């Protein structure tokens, strides 16, 4: 027997004035007047016309897969999850909860807040969300919004299996690694432990629909009608401006002077430019002679945290939201009437050959450009100012966003695929197959970390590494700290390296710079991060204390939560802990050993004593980042001869970030012998081999001496 679609409140009969008679089927409480207000808004969305079609396809489709195709702003991300919850409720939630993935944690939280409001339910009870360091769910949660990378971690581990009745993969056109991987795993039918009657809903922009249709084998597609009304005609500049931030600011100020109605959405390539634009606009708008209140300038990027909800608040003043690719498809803002688009994005692209990230400034895709333009549609249509010529978009922009699985370090993904007992990650289906070189580099790195056994399967150590929500090399360093009795410090460091950057970018005032410099540690950036965290905790996690030192309060709070999660995980899998000893000479050496155990692939040597570092694994020369503690000292000493680094970024300056001095003897002692043998020919490799031979001779001599001492007493006896 097929279940019937759940009836909405107004289908039960009472009018809004009699709402006390209508009961919310999810919690058994009467609907509030707020529910009916929001229901009218929901029914006005373009997607509402497809409600019953979608529920019928979800119920009757034998393959269990439904595609939903619609433009940004059509209501896909808020309504599809609610309809899936109705479907699951009609079946008594016997197959599990409804889980909705989002490519960005901020989007998952924001949608959960909105959907809980529309459903007249309590956030954290029937509707919840799971994002890094924040699990706002409970035992009665029926609808959960989740960062897609967290869900991939759940799928790969033994935890959480069997919890999903409907799985919604939203914003598939974003092409995140986790979203593409989840689709590959589901399409390959490798999730045997999941419920057999699982429903999968893939929600996408129309531009990716043909590719998804072919990938899933022509499943039923629910097309969302286009929103009525005129679409703005883009206004193109003749040339690309030399200063994007200044051009965007002047365009916003011109709109404000004309006092055209509606909010403004500005797209810039990077968070740094977003901050500069917000600072400049906040100063300039105060001097405008306007009839009403000056515009409110709001940033929108991943580091905004909970402050992102300000973009949805009703204000008497005009809102100017400054963002980047984060808002291409997420965060629909109905009040937007004007869009200013730089046409560019700044992305990190990983090069597996040299194990480095490139900061690439590139054109957005045609799909993104169209999504940005549609933000300004309405009655009457708004405006879309493109800070680039039309030929730039036509000739240089790709049709779709680049798949991130072709641009990121795949070591963590391969580790998770191995956890799912997929012997050859290259055999897993992806919408776009990763480069063989990237997969080989990931396998090689995992092999160096002892995460794989002789057959190429996960070793016991690899299974433990896959449990941690950390990069494999950082998880290895954390496990090594158990051996070297520095777990407390390594927990702090792992959290600080994984959370958002704890330092705000200069310029700082002289007073702020002096206070920040006082937090630097002589042993290097890694110890400085530990010292910053401990000072933050001692301050009582005070936000004003952070602001006075140019520290990111939200990032430090995130690190504190993550540290607690890591500690709980180590206790659960019964790993040994150690007491705090930060600052002692022994702890300094132990911490270096733990770091080298995980990061021996990221070592560089100063070749000429001036700070030109040759990377050990390939012949690239880099300098220390300008934010490195070794460079920010007032009287810098000679650069450290050997350093371990966290990141190597190729941009304007090839730079090493988060750097600490190490002794090459530690590298010889702790790195796998075959790793040293595989290094490219260089003076650094020769020095390490000489050290290894000397240490081997010393060890042999020590053993010989010990044996002689043992034999002599035996003779005397």
UniProtKB/Swiss-Prot annotation:
Keywords: ATP-binding, Nucleotide-binding, Nucleus
SUPFAM superfamilies per the UniProt record, alphabetical: P-loop containing nucleoside triphosphate hydrolases (SSF52540)
Motif annotated as DEAQ box, chain positions: 170-173
Biased composition regions of type Polar residues, renumbered to the chain: 699-708
GO annotations of cellular component type: spliceosomal complex
Gene Ontology molecular function terms on file: ATP binding; ATP hydrolysis activity; helicase activity; RNA binding
Region annotation Disordered: where it falls in the sequence: 694-717
Helicase C-terminal domain location: 248-447
Gene3D superfamilies in UniProt: 1.20.120.1080, P-loop containing nucleotide triphosphate hydrolases
Compartments where located: Nucleus
Positions contributing to ATP binding: 70-77
Superkingdom assignment: Eukaryota
Any Pfam family: HA2_N
Domain Helicase ATP-binding: 57-225
Function according to Swiss-Prot or TrEMBL: Might be involved in RNA metabolism; it is missing helicase motif III and may not have helicase activity.
Protein name per Swiss-Prot or TrEMBL: ATP-dependent RNA helicase homolog DQX1
Taxonomic source organism: Homo sapiens
Lineage, opening ranks: Eukaryota, Metazoa, Chordata, Craniata, Vertebrata
């Amino acid at each position: 027997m097929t279940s019937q679609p759940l009836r909405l409140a107004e289908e039960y009969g009472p009018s809004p004035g009699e709402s006390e008679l209508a009961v919310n089927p999810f919690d058994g409480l009467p609907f509030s007047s707020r529910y009916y207000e929001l229901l009218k808004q929901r029914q006005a969305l373009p997607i509402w016309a497809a409600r019953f079609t979608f529920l019928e396809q979800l119920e009757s489709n034998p393959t269990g897969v439904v595609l939903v195709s619609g433009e940004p702003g059509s209501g896909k991300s808020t309504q599809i999850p609610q309809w899936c919850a109705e479907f699951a409720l009609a079946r008594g939630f016997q197959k599990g909860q409804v889980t909705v993935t989002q490519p960005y944690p901020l989007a998952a939280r924001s949608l959960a807040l909105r959907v809980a409001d529309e459903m007249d339910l309590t956030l954290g009870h029937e509707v919840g969300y799971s994002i890094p360091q924040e699990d706002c769910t409970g035992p009665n949660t029926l609808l959960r919004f989740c960062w897609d990378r967290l869900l991939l971690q759940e799928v790969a581990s033994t935890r959480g299996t069997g919890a999903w009745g409907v799985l919604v993969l939203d914003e598939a056109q974003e092409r995140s690694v986790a979203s593409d991987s989840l689709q590959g795993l589901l399409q390959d039918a490798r999730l045997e432990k999941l419920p057999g009657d699982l429903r999968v809903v893939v929600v996408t922009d129309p531009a990716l629909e043909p590719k998804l249709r072919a990938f899933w084998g022509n499943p039923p597609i629910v097309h969302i009608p286009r929103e009525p009304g005129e679409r703005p005609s883009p206004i193109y500049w003749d040339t690309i401006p030399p200063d994007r931030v200044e051009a965007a600011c002047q365009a916003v100020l011109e709109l404000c002077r004309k006092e055209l109605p509606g909010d403004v959405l500005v797209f810039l390539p990077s968070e740094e430019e977003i901050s500069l634009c917000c600072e400049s606009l906040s100063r300039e708008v105060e001097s405008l002679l306007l009839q009403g209140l000056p515009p409110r300038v709001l940033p929108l990027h991943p580091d905004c945290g909970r402050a992102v909800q300000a973009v949805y608040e009703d204000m008497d003043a005009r809102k100017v939201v400054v963002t980047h690719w984060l808002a291409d498809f997420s965060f629909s803002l109905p009040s937007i009437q004007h869009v200013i688009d730089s046409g560019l994005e700044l992305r990190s692209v990983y090069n597996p050959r040299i194990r480095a990230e490139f900061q690439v400034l590139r054109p957005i895709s045609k799909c993104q450009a169209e999504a940005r333009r549609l933000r300004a549609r309405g009655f009457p249509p708004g405006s879309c100012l493109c800070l680039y010529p039309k030929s730039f978009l036509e000739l240089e922009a790709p049709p779709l966003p680049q798949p991130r699985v072709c641009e990121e370090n795949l070591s963590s993904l391969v580790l998770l695929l191995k956890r799912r007992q997929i012997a050859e990650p290259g055999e897993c289906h992806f919408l776009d197959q990763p480069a063989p070189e990237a997969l080989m580099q990931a396998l090689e790195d995992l092999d160096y970390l002892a995460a794989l056994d002789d057959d190429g399967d996960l070793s016991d150590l690899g299974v433990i590494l896959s449990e941690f929500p950390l990069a494999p090399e950082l998880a290895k360093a954390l496990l090594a700290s158990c051996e070297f009795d520095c777990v407390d410090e390594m927990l702090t460091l792992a959290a600080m390296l994984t959370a958002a950057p704890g330092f705000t970018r200069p310029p700082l005032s002289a007073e702020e710079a002096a206070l920040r410099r006082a937090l630097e540690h002589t042993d290097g950036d890694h110890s400085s991060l530990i010292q910053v965290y401990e000072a933050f905790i001692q301050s009582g996690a005070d936000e004003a204390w952070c602001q006075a030192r140019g520290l990111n309060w939200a990032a430090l709070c995130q690190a504190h939560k993550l540290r607690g999660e890591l500690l709980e995980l180590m206790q659960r899998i019964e790993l040994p802990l150690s007491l705090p000893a930060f600052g002692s000479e022994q702890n300094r050496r132990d911490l270096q050993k733990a770091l080298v155990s995980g990061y021996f692939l990221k070592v560089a040597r100063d070749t000429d004593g001036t700070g030109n570092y040759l990377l050990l694994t390939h012949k690239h020369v880099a300098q220390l980042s300008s934010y490195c503690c070794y460079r920010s000292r007032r009287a810098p000493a000679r650069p450290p001869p050997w350093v371990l680094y966290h990141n190597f970024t190729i941009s304007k300056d090839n730079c090493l970030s988060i750097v600490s001095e190490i002794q090459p003897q530690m590298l010889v002692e702790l790195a796998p012998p075959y790793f040293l043998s595989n290094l490219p020919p260089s003076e650094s490799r020769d020095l390490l081999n000489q050290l290894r031979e000397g240490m081997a001779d010393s060890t042999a001599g020590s053993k010989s001496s010990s044996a002689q001492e043992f034999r002599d007493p035996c003779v005397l006896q």
